[in-house]
Design a protein with these regions (language model features):
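Mature N-terminal, pre-catalytic/accessory segment of carbohydrate-active enzymes
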Residues: 12-152
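Bacterial N-terminal signal peptides
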Residues: 2-13
């Protein structure tokens, strides 16, 4: 009885609150959308990234190729099953919870459980979630295109 209650509590605990701490700056990218594409290119398919950004897959492909990324590589089922901690870490300072959940294809309960119970992840992430504005795709301006060429 106690173990069932404990499991129920663990599975229904809410996500930790966001802090007032701003996300880590990413001055080496033209904007957060470019950083998002760069960090997720080998881990998440373009369709999912586009869905999170409110873009078309072609937009994500164009951004990746403009920064010199090849492919995209095939995302195997093994990568989809095993890369979730890397995906969380790479996007912790880029995405609000809602978009992170959409990227992972998870529920709030799944993410909350993973943060608490999987490999001390909440501690490793600094025991806080910065307040990140939602990412929304917009076509890159001339300055962003120039920076894309420098990155490539």
């Amino acid at each position: 009885m106690i173990s069932i209650t404990l499991i129920t509590l663990l599975l229904t605990a809410p996500l930790p609150a966001t802090s007032d701490t701003p996300p880590v700056a990413i001055p080496h990218f033209p904007d957060a959308v470019h950083a998002f594409v760069w960090r997720n290119w080998p881990l998440v398919d373009c369709e999912r990234m586009a869905q999170v950004l409110g873009a078309k897959p072609e937009d994500v492909l164009r951004l990746g190729h403009a920064m010199g990324l090849e492919g995209p590589p095939p995302i195997t089922s093994e990568v989809k099953d095993r890369a979730y901690i890397t995906i969380i870490r790479r996007n912790w300072h880029l995405l609000p919870y809602e978009q992170l959940l959409e990227l992972l294809g998870w529920t709030e309960e799944e993410l909350a459980y993973t943060l608490r119970e999987d490999d001390f992840l909440w501690i490793k992430l600094g025991s806080m979630k910065p307040t990140c504005p939602p990412l929304k795709y917009t076509p890159p301006d001339e300055a962003a295109q120039a920076r894309e060429k420098e990155i490539a």
